[in-house]
């Protein structure tokens, strides 16, 4: 039996700490002065180094994907001064410009030759997705367009996961891993800020409308996504075994400030079949536990 409630700060994208808070915590605890790495630029989350994890009493170590929400890897860290005045470290592929409104825009995969996919409003502290929705013709909608970001996991991604699991395991903390590909309808992912020219249904409002009026389309997307995900999980497990304690399977929000995004019946018919398949595979083939973020909609 556990001896206490485990503490998770920074284990997943839904339990992270903003880079400004990480920097302030390092100062508060008198830790070594250093620039904080922005490992997840979409929310501007700061990487929690071992010294801070120790003083905060954090019980988990994170394994995060090789690519960020904007589709680039965190390689060759370089300094960047944020619009809110904090100097941080970002990937060499973190490419931004300030537009005519004073907003900071960021580019998918670090490619400034394509339209930006994220915007940090002037005075803001994190990025919002820029919706890049082509006109929708219901007669030509193809579920494969909403599956562009899902595919067989690459050798590079498997190698990254294996390396990061080894690093996290060496900390002695519980290993919480994000492999990707198992989030069904996560609205943060629908606009695809990591793709240069996303196709399919990418507008946030249009996606939620589609869960009502284009439900067959959504089922086709989820069904194929689930097939791909299960194959990828099998390959990941073959590479790392049961070295992971918890897998963050999905960040899809079902809660609002006042209620839920959908009824329990809709959840059971549209989403639950796919969560059930993922969880049954994990619990049937591994010793991993699973974690599902629901945004308070328990």
Per-range role (PLM):
Residues 6-9, 61, 105-106:
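Short, hydrophobic/proline-enriched secondary-structure or compact coil segments at domain edges
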Residues 71-73, 77, 94, 116-117, ...:
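Alpha/beta catalytic barrel-like cores
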Residues 81, 88-93, 150-157:
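Extended, Lys/Arg-enriched charged tracts that mediate electrostatic binding to polyanionic substrates
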Residues 1-27, 31-38, 118-298:
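Active-site loop segments of alpha/beta catalytic cores
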Residues 22, 26-71:
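Segments that shape or occlude catalytic/ligand-binding pockets
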């Amino acid at each position: 039996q556990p001896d206490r409630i485990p503490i998770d700060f920074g284990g997943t994208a839904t339990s992270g700490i903003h880079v400004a808070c990480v920097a302030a915590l390092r100062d508060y605890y008198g830790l070594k002065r250093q620039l904080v790495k922005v490992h997840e630029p979409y929310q501007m989350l700061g990487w929690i180094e071992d010294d801070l994890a120790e003083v905060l009493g954090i019980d988990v170590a994170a394994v995060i994907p090789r690519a960020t929400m904007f589709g680039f890897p965190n390689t060759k860290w370089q300094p960047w001064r944020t619009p809110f005045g904090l100097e941080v470290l970002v990937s060499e592929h973190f490419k931004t410009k300030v537009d005519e409104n004073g907003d900071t825009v960021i580019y998918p995969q670090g490619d400034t030759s394509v339209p930006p996919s994220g915007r940090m409003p002037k005075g803001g502290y994190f990025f919002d997705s820029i919706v890049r929705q082509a006109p929708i013709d219901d007669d030509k909608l193809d579920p494969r367009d909403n599956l562009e970001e899902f595919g067989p996991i690459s050798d590079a991604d498997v190698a990254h996961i294996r390396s990061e699991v080894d690093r996290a395991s060496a900390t002695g903390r519980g290993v919480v891993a994000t492999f990707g590909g198992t989030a069904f309808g996560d609205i943060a992912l629908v606009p695809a800020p990591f793709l240069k020219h996303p196709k399919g249904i990418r507008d946030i409002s249009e996606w939620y409308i589609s869960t009502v009026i284009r439900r067959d389309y959504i089922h086709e997307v989820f069904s194929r996504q689930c097939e791909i995900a299960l194959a990828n999980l099998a390959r990941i497990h073959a590479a790392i075994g049961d070295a992971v304690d918890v897998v963050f399977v999905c960040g899809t929000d079902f809660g609002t400030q006042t209620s839920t995004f959908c009824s329990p019946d809709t959840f059971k018919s549209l989403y639950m079949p796919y969560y059930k398949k993922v969880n049954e595979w994990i619990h049937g083939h591994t010793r991993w536990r699973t974690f599902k973020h629901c945004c308070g909609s328990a």
